[in-house]
């Protein structure tokens, strides 16, 4: 036993010695992050919002601004109301603060009921009832209980007062002009839609889409663009339950609480004005900054041309140029060519700084080569725009003369 134990000790010592003399294991190399430089913020079609401000600083009128960004269009008129889905209200019904003269309209019959007053009643609610019906209930602040007031076979809406306070799931109150309608979109719960005049709607849009401190001509241009955008989508949503959402997927809308004196003035100064092409409302797209050139679209009034106003001095544009980094793993996942060896822009528009907006991007990796559109890269890497370059890559080619095959 003793000899075996000694032998085991000797063998163990030899292994330790051999291990100590072996070369240390080299840490696996980590692929570096990818640096991406760019210009602008958004798709670049239609009006640059910072460009409109730059043009206003340069002394251009609202008409000159709109003529530049929507060439070939004419001024028209529009009135009426708009239906906006309120995304922040994720409850099963529509809950509002109780105020005098608040009413409920039965949308099936058109009849309006004035809600009763009560000293301790401080909330009203429209909730689902039966098959596609609604019920209206009140909340008593003293007893802390809900009491059923009336049932309806169809949808209903609160109306009758200048401003109604919508109670959100967080308990916060957001005020809206017009009516607050309950609609059944999914069959599972009721969504909230604000039915409001077009002009009052714009009062809640313009200060959310532009800075209220901007020059009057820039704010007026934003008002006309937003009004036109609304009317265009309204004309295509007649059979739907709402016309627009209230987020960046449509136009940002904050209701009454977002209104500012300067933007209300801009809306009033352009009351009813929209832009037409061949007698019809245009797709009045706009984005924060086009980087120095407008982007071409699928309609005649969305053209590719240089824009000297986007980076105009004192416009305050923070996205004239920008630089970001993305982890190597994230970039590799986008292109799916293994370890990235090179990234380069293959084609550009040829208009604007650095050869213009990128059109296609090539990645060469350990598993091959892949070409994506610049918009695909923008979306998948969460970039501010598709006007991009890869400054650390010696293979980046800004020339508009290089095609998708690299020739």
Predicted regions and their residues:
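Conserved, single-site charged/polar hotspot
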Residues: 2-407
């Amino acid at each position: 036993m003793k000899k075996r134990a000694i032998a085991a000790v000797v063998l163990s010592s030899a292994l330790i010695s051999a291990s100590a003399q072996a070369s240390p294991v080299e840490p696996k190399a980590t692929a570096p992050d990818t640096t991406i430089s760019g210009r602008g913020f958004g798709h670049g079609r239609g009006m640059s919002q910072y460009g409109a401000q730059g043009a206003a600083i340069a002394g251009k009128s609202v008409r000159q601004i709109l003529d530049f960004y929507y060439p070939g269009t004419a001024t028209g008129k529009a009135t009426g109301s708009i239906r906006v889905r309120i995304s922040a209200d994720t409850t099963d019904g529509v809950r509002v603060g109780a105020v005098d003269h608040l009413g409920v309209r039965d949308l099936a019959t058109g009849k309006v009921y004035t809600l009763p007053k009560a000293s301790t009643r401080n909330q009203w609610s429209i909730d689902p009832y039966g098959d596609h019906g609604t019920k209206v209930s009140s909340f008593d602040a003293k007893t802390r209980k809900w009491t059923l007031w009336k049932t309806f076979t169809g949808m209903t809406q609160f109306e009758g007062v200048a401003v109604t306070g919508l109670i959100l799931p967080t308990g916060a109150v957001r005020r809206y002009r017009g009516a607050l309608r309950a609609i059944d979109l999914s069959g599972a719960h009721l969504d909230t839609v604000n039915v409001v005049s077009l002009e009052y709607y714009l009062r809640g849009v313009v200060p959310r889409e532009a800075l209220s401190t901007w020059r009057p001509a820039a704010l007026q241009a934003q008002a006309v663009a937003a009004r036109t955008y609304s009317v265009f989508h309204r004309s295509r949503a007649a059979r739907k339950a709402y016309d627009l959402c209230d987020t960046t997927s449509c136009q940002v809308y904050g209701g009454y609480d977002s209104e500012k004196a300067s933007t209300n003035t801009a809306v009033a100064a352009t009351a009813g004005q929209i832009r037409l092409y061949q007698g019809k409302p245009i797709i009045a797209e706009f984005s924060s900054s086009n980087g120095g050139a407008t982007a071409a679209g699928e309609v005649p009034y969305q053209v590719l041309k240089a824009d000297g106003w986007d980076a105009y001095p004192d416009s305050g544009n923070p996205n004239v140029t920008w630089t970001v980094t993305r982890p190597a793993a994230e970039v590799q996942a986008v292109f799916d060519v293994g370890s990235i060896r090179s990234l380069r822009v293959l084609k550009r528009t040829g208009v604007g700084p650095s050869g213009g907006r990128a059109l296609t991007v090539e990645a060469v990796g350990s598993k091959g080569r892949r070409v994506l559109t610049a918009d695909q890269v923008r979306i998948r890497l969460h970039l501010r725009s598709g006007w991009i370059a890869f400054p650390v890559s010696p293979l980046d080619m800004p020339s508009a003369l290089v095609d998708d095959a690299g020739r």
